[in-house]
Amino acid sequence: MMWSNFFLQEENRRRGAAGRRRAHGQGRSGLTPEREGKVKLALLLAAVGATLAVLSVGTEFWVELNTYKANGSAVCEAAHLGLWKACTKRLWQADVPVDRDTCGPAELPGEANCTYFKFFTTGENARIFQRTTKKEVNLAAAVIAVLGLAVMALGCLCIIMVLSKGAEFLLRVGAVCFGLSGLLLLVSLEVFRHSVRALLQRVSPEPPPAPRLTYEYSWSLGCGVGAGLILLLGAGCFLLLTLPSWPWGSLCPKRGHRAT
């Protein structure tokens, strides 16, 4: 009888300790399953924007510069550039669509020559088709984009802390970070547009003469626009999750609370 009481007390003690650990874990988490699911959905939306942002900043298809096709020549030249480097390509005119007056698109196969911009290291301006970049504007666009990525990474860290540690106060911080990163990316895109216009206007007087150019924005810049908008939308979702539930509960009452 004594041994049975001892084992019974030991079993009760273990069950009580396990229950306290579960209660402590739930109190530390602080998120109901429903609320945790909403946070994960908003984080998934922000992750899509983050992926597009990294893809946009890391690629060099922000803008394409196209020369006009020359009569009697089998090749023509085009270029595409981003925040970090520029690539010039020699394309076969037979591969260029017949309805185009200019060389391109830059995705066509051809002999490519890609170089990183030197104003990040030596401070020199780059020359593309006898035109000179304005390094101050290009540097500003790149720095703003990198700041946007850094703030975006901080926002991801805040939301991960919310899900793992239950620190709900970081929801608001994460929302601010994602919103700020989206704004910074959009500002970087606008600054880059000004750098393209400055490049087209800074024609070198040295021979040979600069060719006529047309330009068109490419898919990397489109990814940046989409990333900025999605990050802003994700920030709005996180901000909605920080609001108290009673205004929404009064507008959308639960079906179970009906008058009998």
Curated annotation (Swiss-Prot):
GO cellular component: L-type voltage-gated calcium channel complex; plasma membrane; voltage-gated calcium channel complex
Expression sites by tissue: Detected in heart left ventricle.
Location of the region described as Disordered in the Swiss-Prot/TrEMBL record: 14-33
Membrane topology term: Multi-pass membrane protein
The entry's keywords: Calcium, Calcium channel, Calcium transport, Cell membrane, Ion channel, Ion transport, Membrane, Transmembrane, Transmembrane helix, Transport, Voltage-gated channel
MF-aspect GO terms: calcium channel regulator activity; voltage-gated calcium channel activity
InterPro entries, per database record: PMP22/EMP/MP20/Claudin, VDCC_g6su, VDCC_gsu
Subcellular location: Cell membrane
Biased composition (Basic residues): 15-25
TM spans (from-to): 43-63, 143-163, 169-189, 221-241
Gene Ontology process terms (BP): calcium ion transport; regulation of calcium ion transmembrane transport via high voltage-gated calcium channel
Family of the protein in this entry: Belongs to the PMP-22/EMP/MP20 family. CACNG subfamily.
Assembly, per entry: Interacts with CACNA1C. Identified in a complex with the L-type calcium channel subunits CACNA1C, CACNA2D1 and either CACNB1 or CACNB2.
Reported function: Regulates the activity of L-type calcium channels that contain CACNA1C as pore-forming subunit.
Annotated protein name in UniProt: Voltage-dependent calcium channel gamma-6 subunit
Organism the protein comes from: Homo sapiens
Lineage of the organism: Eukaryota, Metazoa, Chordata, Craniata, Vertebrata
